[in-house]
C-alpha cells in the first residue's frame, strides 16, 4: 500500500477513505473497531503524513499497550473505561514516524489474557 502512495498510483486520502469504508461495512458484524478516529485520520492523510516506509498506510491500534493521546485506553477492561492517555506510547510515536495513519483502536480481551475477544 505504501508503494502505491509513494508512486502516486493512489493518494493517502484515497487509501484512508477505502480503509474507513471497509471498516464501516464490516464492523457491525465483527465489532473489531471499538474507537474510531476516522475524521482525524482523513485530516492527517490530507495534510500529509511522514514519508517513512509505511507512508499513508491505514493502521488500527490494538487497545492494549498502544496508548494514543486522546483515545480511550481500556485494555478491554471496565476498570479502565475512563482512562484517556495524555501522551502516545513510544511504539505509537515510532509507527507514526514510519508513516502509518492511525484509524482507531480495536477490541482486545480483558488485559489480553484470553485467546478470544468477548468484550464488554
Question: PLM ranges: what are they?
Answer:
Residues 1-120:
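Gly/Ser-rich catalytic/binding loops embedded in alpha/beta enzyme cores
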Amino acid at each position: 500500500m505504501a508503494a502505491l502512495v509513494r508512486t502516486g498510483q493512489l493518494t493517502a486520502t484515497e487509501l484512508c477513505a477505502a480503509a474507513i469504508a471497509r471498516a464501516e461495512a464490516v464492523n457491525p458484524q465483527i465489532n473489531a473497531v471499538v474507537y474510531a478516529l476516522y475524521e482525524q485520520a482523513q485530516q492527517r492523510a490530507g495534510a500529509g503524513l511522514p514519508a517513512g516506509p509505511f507512508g499513508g498506510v491505514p493502521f488500527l491500534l490494538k487497545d492494549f499497550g498502544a496508548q494514543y493521546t486522546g483515545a480511550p485506553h481500556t485494555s478491554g477492561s471496565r476498570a479502565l473505561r475512563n482512562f484517556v492517555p495524555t501522551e502516545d506510547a513510544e511504539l505509537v510515536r515510532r509507527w507514526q514516524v514510519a508513516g502509518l495513519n492511525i484509524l482507531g483502536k480495536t477490541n482486545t480481551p480483558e488485559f489480553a489474557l484470553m485467546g478470544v475477544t468477548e468484550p464488554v
